[in-house]
Structures are given as C-alpha cells and as structure tokens.
C-alpha cells in the first residue's frame, strides 16, 4: 500500500451531527470517522494533505458498538474511532463546495 492509499484509508468520512455542526462554527473543529488503526499523527498528516489545511490539534476517541437485537439473536453494531480535528486560524474545510 503506497502513501496515497494510506491517506485515503485513514480518514473514512466526516461525522455530521448537530453537535459537530456547532463545533465547526464555534471553534473550527471538524469531526471525522477514521480507521480503527489510525493514530493522531496519521490523522493529522492525512487531513493536512487531503484538504490542504493546517491542523492545530487532534483528539481521538473510540466509540463502542451498541447492543442490538436482530430478531431473537442479540448482537452489537461495529465499534469505530472518531477524531476531533482542530484547524489553525484562517483555515476551513468546505464539504459542500459552495463559496
């Protein structure tokens, strides 16, 4: 796997919710779902290279899978990893494409 593939596999997708929308407006923090094996340094370099922005800090947390029932069978949803990426002042990521 070359470095470009690793960058694309590190950041899975942006995590969009009311809380993350408020964070992005208030203090330019973007939330991503990232690979389970990703470290803070991996996420920082991937975001800086993919979106051409300057990252100030990265906080990562593991989200446990929730217990669910599938008919009579008890199971769990998949666990995943979330990264809070704080961008440097003057930098922004525009996912919609509108100016």
From Swiss-Prot:
It comes from the Bacteria. GO terms for biological process: translation. It holds the Pfam family Ribosomal_L23. SUPFAM superfamilies: Ribosomal proteins S24e, L23 and L15e. Keywords: Ribonucleoprotein, Ribosomal protein, RNA-binding, rRNA-binding. GO terms for molecular function: rRNA binding; structural constituent of ribosome. GO terms for cellular component: ribonucleoprotein complex; ribosome. The keyword Oxidoreductase does not apply. InterPro entries: Nucleotide-bd_a/b_plait_sf, Ribosomal_uL23-like, Ribosomal_uL23/eL15/eS24_sf, Ribosomal_uL23_CS. Belongs to the universal ribosomal protein uL23 family. PANTHER family: 60S RIBOSOMAL PROTEIN L23A (PTHR11620). HAMAP family: Ribosomal_uL23_B. Part of the 50S ribosomal subunit. Contacts protein L29, and trigger factor when it is bound to the ribosome. One of the early assembly proteins it binds 23S rRNA. One of the proteins that surrounds the polypeptide exit tunnel on the outside of the ribosome. Forms the main docking site for trigger factor binding to the ribosome. This is Large ribosomal subunit protein uL23.
